[in-house]
């Protein structure tokens, strides 16, 4: 007697998360496939980016590339632009290149870039 699809689904529904994870791993090894398809779908999303570049971009990211010579002034500006504490702002500046602000308007990005450059930082707006 063959097992029906419904019986297989019912059996899988009653498995614990650990048992299900082991089953997936065994199936991947047996059939030489990967269950990471959602990652591949998400990676395909940015491919549409160049087509959208014809339209005007509405969200920008301010990236701190380097702190420059006056790191203390840059840390102060980063704290002013964000809601970060002193340690977090210092870690961000020390870890450059890092995003300072993401998903902001063109005007806000230009203002943030101006403040950071005046403090001596090297900044990129994407």
UniProtKB/Swiss-Prot annotation:
How is this protein annotated for GO cellular component?
cytosolic large ribosomal subunit
GO process terms (BP) = translation
Alphabetically list the UniProt keywords.
Ribonucleoprotein, Ribosomal protein
Q: Does the keyword Transmembrane helix apply?
A: no
**Which Pfam families does the protein's record reference?**
Ribosomal_L12, Ribosomal_L12_N
The Gene Ontology terms for molecular function here are: mRNA binding; structural constituent of ribosome
* Functional summary from the UniProt entry: Forms part of the ribosomal stalk which helps the ribosome interact with GTP-bound translation factors. Is thus essential for accurate translation.
Fetch the PANTHER family from UniProt: 39S RIBOSOMAL PROTEIN L12, LARGE RIBOSOMAL SUBUNIT PROTEIN BL12M
Oligomeric and partner information: Homodimer. Part of the ribosomal stalk of the 50S ribosomal subunit. Forms a multimeric L10(L12)X complex, where L10 forms an elongated spine to which 2 to 4 L12 dimers bind in a sequential fashion. Binds GTP-bound translation factors.
State the protein's name: Large ribosomal subunit protein bL12
Q: Which organism is it from?
A: Citrifermentans bemidjiense (strain ATCC BAA-1014 / DSM 16622 / JCM 12645 / Bem) (Geobacter bemidjiensis)
């Amino acid at each position: 007697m063959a097992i029906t699809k419904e019986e297989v689904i019912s059996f899988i529904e009653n498995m614990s998360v650990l048992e299900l994870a082991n089953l997936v791993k065994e199936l991947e090894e047996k059939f030489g496939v990967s269950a990471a398809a959602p990652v591949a779908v998400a990676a395909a999303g940015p491919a549409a980016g160049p087509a959208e570049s014809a339209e005007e971009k509405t969200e920008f990211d301010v990236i701190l590339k380097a702190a420059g010579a006056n790191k203390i002034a840059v840390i102060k500006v980063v704290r002013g632009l964000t809601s970060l504490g002193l340690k977090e702002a210092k870690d961000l500046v020390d870890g450059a290149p890092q995003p300072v602000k993401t998903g902001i308007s063109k005007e806000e990005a230009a203002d943030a870039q101006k403040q950071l450059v005046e403090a001596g930082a090297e900044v990129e707006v994407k």
